[in-house]
């Protein structure tokens, strides 16, 4: 299905029938990604002992009905909001934009700490997604102001699809990189790492606070100057997608909570003209 859109004075053609999914498959019976020591996501047949119902056709029931247990922040692709850091509850699904968002996809190689940093000070073995790397990778010719950025870290190993990050220190954003995204007006960030901050960072959450516009130590939602921003973590960006301009759609269920499982979709533009 072809559509023609006008964005920032530029006419764009896009095939809405062929999106590329950036969501990791969460296989309850197989290998699956997880982070921060969370248990595996799991499912089991729902049972009502009083009624004698067991939600499994294999076990003789009339239909399948499963009880699913997972930690959205740690099991698979998820989208979160400023409510991740505040006393007041904010549901991520209420913040996720409806429709398509102008986006750019960039590929970067995380770098050793140098002139850029975070809080607490990165360890020598840490690897950072830096402002410098983002500036180098940013597409030169983008037909619109990107409101979303998708970051693919290199090397892009297929093992990311089911990696257990527990006990590891995956790459994370430098505070300079987070500030760059904010300065460029990016409201929606998609990354293929489990967190934009260091896994164990003494609770600082520096990049999160910068991206959501939440001052250090503040826990009131009213203090967040970018409460309409979202961060999507643990995505996977296939190699078949070239760096450049796209349209992003964030699909999420209407579940309460500051993070929800999500399915980011990228739509390639078939043409554009100013």
Go through each PLM region and give its residues.
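Active-/binding-site microenvironments in catalytic and ligand-binding cores
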Residues: 1-274
């Amino acid at each position: 299905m072809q559509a023609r859109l006008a964005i920032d004075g530029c006419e764009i053609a896009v095939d809405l029938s062929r999106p590329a999914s950036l969501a990791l498959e969460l296989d309850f019976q197989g290998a699956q990604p997880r982070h921060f020591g969370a248990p595996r996501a799991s499912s089991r047949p729902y049972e009502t002992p009083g009624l004698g119902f067991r939600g499994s056709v294999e076990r003789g029931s009339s239909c399948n009905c499963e009880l699913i247990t997972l930690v959205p922040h740690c099991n698979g692709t998820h989208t979160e909001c400023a409510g991740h850091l505040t006393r007041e509850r904010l549901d991520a699904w209420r913040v996720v934009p409806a429709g398509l968002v102008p986006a750019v996809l960039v590929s970067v190689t995380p770098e050793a700490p140098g002139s850029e940093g975070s809080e607490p000070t990165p360890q020598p073995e840490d690897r950072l997604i830096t402002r410098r790397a983002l500036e180098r990778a940013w597409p030169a010719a983008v037909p619109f102001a990107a409101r979303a950025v998708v970051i693919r870290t290199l090397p892009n190993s297929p093992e990311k699809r089911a990696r257990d990050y527990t006990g590891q220190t995956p790459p994370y954003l430098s505070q300079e990189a987070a500030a760059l995204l904010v300065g460029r007006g990016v409201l929606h960030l998609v990354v293929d790492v489990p967190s934009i901050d260091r896994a164990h960072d003494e609770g600082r959450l520096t990049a999160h606070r910068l991206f959501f516009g939440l001052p250090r130590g503040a826990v009131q939602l009213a203090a967040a100057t970018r409460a309409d921003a979202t961060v999507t973590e643990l995505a996977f960006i296939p190699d078949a997608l070239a760096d450049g301009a796209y349209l992003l759609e964030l699909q999420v269920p209407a579940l309460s909570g500051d993070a929800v499982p999500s399915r980011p979709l990228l739509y390639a533009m078939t043409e554009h003209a100013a």
